[in-house]
Amino acid sequence: MSQYQRLLLIINPLLRQSPALNHAAAVAKASGASLHIAALIPSLDILSLLEEGDRKVARASYLQEHRDWLKDQAEKMQGRGIEVTTEVAWADNMRQDILDHVTEMHPDLLIKQVQHEPVLKRAFFTPLDWRLLRHCPVPVYLVGAQSHALPQKVVAAVDVGDTEPSNSELNDRIILQASALALQCNAELHLLYACDIPAAFLADLGGGLTLSELTRELRKDLETSFLKLAARFGVPAECRHFITGHPVSALSEFAHEHQIDVIVMGRTQYGSLEKLLGSTTEHILYQVPCSILAV
């Protein structure tokens, strides 16, 4: 995986204490990549109550206030040797505007702060972060609230339970992206698989074996596959983690216990059920304090 060349950071300028600013600056500095910061502002309905002339003045004044602030942030980054450009604009369709920026820029990473949404709201509306995970053509780096600006511990979360060629290719991409991030940030690289063996699946296997015997056999096969994958990419033994449990809860517990800064995960193709319920990567956003890099 080559070194980063261009990074795109999307921010809401109303959230001026966003950790995403520091994360993007730190990764850009470490990698030598250029950084473009797009401050996209959702349309303010209250401005529609003003007369047209007053509305134009208010919109221009509002944008200028945020431009001045962002210019100050950019100058501080430039003082640290970071190549940075900025823009402030209204966003009538946030998802599409972000994707348009990605299409135009072709960045190596799209960086954005995790936007937490209440469970009830997620039941009726697909969160913006989920939509970006599903439709963004480049890796999406969603910054959590509690991790080092420059990652110190990166974990590649793979799935060795699916033997389809497409999943094997995804595992490779996950590890390569995690390796690239860890290398450029001088961070530790860990490899993890959360082994979750559903009883319903085992019950269908038959063969005269007991459930516990089937569990042991399947676990042994999965661990062998995991160790082969780790060996192929040269992951040291002390950085290999074969853990048991549901992926969301197991990853969350591991991230807390080991103070992980970034979890690198894959994005899958969605059927109707997955679109409704959300994937492991989408749900983990709300369970861990660290950042997620989805590839």
Language model segments and positions:
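Structural beta-alpha unit
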Residues: 1-3, 16, 75-110, 117, ...
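Short, structured interface segments
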Residues: 127-148
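Glycine-rich, Arg-bearing micro-motifs that act as flexible, cationic patches
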Residues: 112-131, 262-287
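General small-molecule cofactor/ligand-binding pocket signal
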Residues: 36-38, 85-89, 141, 190-192, ...
